[in-house]
Curated annotation (Swiss-Prot):
It comes from Arabidopsis thaliana. Belongs to the plant LTP family. Residues 1-21 form the signal peptide. This is Non-specific lipid transfer protein GPI-anchored 20. GO terms for cellular component: chloroplast envelope; plasma membrane; side of membrane.
Length: 203
């Protein structure tokens, strides 16, 4: 029993270190907080019938977020919520002023500023492939003594490793890169919960 308790305490300590050091701002918006601001969705996505001003329900839900969900409110106002919502940044930024809450953008700057330089993130699972290099690739000049190529193109032949096809004449193909929406990271709390279940199963 004491081994399991010490294992659980060690896991909590290990999982709490990256969380305390990083405080990712995107994790501050939960689905329940997004439900709270659902009256504002029509306004910040430019799909409301009113279009020019938010409803009183929207402003009230915005005020309720200032007490317990300022981080989420800042993400909504800046248009960087971690959900797939087509937020119009211009109308989202104007939302606090339209609701007569002019201090919200200043509070958001103070709230977001420390999270601008997080430490290295520990992710579990596939990560995005690196982007293209900034230095342009300059092809080497071809020597003049080469034999002339025929005008007909050669057909593509599959490579030995079965990967992407290549051509005999030096042509290249590119592999599709992983998009941010297809990349994922495993939540530390989910990892902890899974390990705790395994530990309890063998107890």
């Amino acid at each position: 029993m004491s081994k399991i308790i010490s294992l659980v305490v060690a896991m909590i300590a290990v999982l709490a270190l990256p969380i305390r050091g990083q405080q990712q701002p995107l994790s501050q918006c939960t689905p329940s907080m997004m439900t709270t601001v659902s009256p504002c969705m029509g306004f910040i996505t430019n799909s409301s019938s009113n279009g020019t001003s938010p409803s009183s329900d929207c402003c009230n839900s915005l005020r309720s977020l200032t007490t317990g969900g300022m981080g989420c409110l800042c993400l909504i106002v800046t248009g960087t919520v971690p959900f797939n919502i087509p937020i119009n940044r211009t109308t989202a930024v104007s939302l606090p002023r339209a609701c007569n809450m002019p201090r919200v953008p200043l509070q958001c700057q103070a709230n977001i500023a420390p999270a601008a330089a997080p430490g290295p993130a520990a992710t579990f699972g596939p990560s995005m492939s690196p982007g293209p290099e900034t230095d342009p690739i300059v092809p080497e000049p071809t020597p003049a003594a080469q034999t002339p190529q025929s005008d007909t193109t050669r057909p593509f032949t599959p490579s030995v490793d079965g990967g992407a096809p290549t051509s005999d004449d030096g042509g290249s193909t590119s592999r599709p890169s992983e998009t941010p929406s297809s990349a994922y990271a495993l939540s530390p709390s989910l990892l902890f919960f899974s390990i705790a279940l395994v530990a309890l199963k063998f107890y």
